[in-house]
């Protein structure tokens, strides 16, 4: 089976925008009316959005942990997310 070309990167969108798009994708997939190729493309986009959302949530959680650190004397450092 030929190897598929890498899909283009998702443009950075707000978490809420990505979540809304993901909900729309789920609705279209659950309708069962999409042709197979369209359904696969929608599924692939959904997986990308989920991964982006997970990364956003992880970064937010890390920022909260830094802010709630028990060491009140520790200086706050700017949060720099890992980019992949």
UniProtKB/Swiss-Prot annotation:
SUPFAM superfamilies per record: XseB-like
Substrates-to-products reaction catalysed: Exonucleolytic cleavage in either 5'- to 3'- or 3'- to 5'-direction to yield nucleoside 5'-phosphates
Keyword Nuclease carried by entry: yes
Biological processes annotated in GO: DNA catabolic process
Gene3D superfamilies: Exonuclease VII, small subunit (1.10.287.1040)
One Gene Ontology cellular component annotation held by this UniProt entry: cytosol
Coiled-coil annotated spans: none
InterPro entries: Exonuc_VII_S, Exonuc_VII_ssu_sf
Keyword Zinc: no
Compartment(s) of residence: Cytoplasm
Enzyme category, top tier: hydrolase
Keyword annotations of the record: Cytoplasm, Exonuclease, Hydrolase, Nuclease
Family of this protein: Belongs to the XseB family.
Subunit structure, interactors included: Heterooligomer composed of large and small subunits.
Biological function: Bidirectionally degrades single-stranded DNA into large acid-insoluble oligonucleotides, which are then degraded further into small acid-soluble oligonucleotides.
Record's protein name: Exodeoxyribonuclease 7 small subunit
Organism: Yersinia pseudotuberculosis serotype O:3 (strain YPIII)
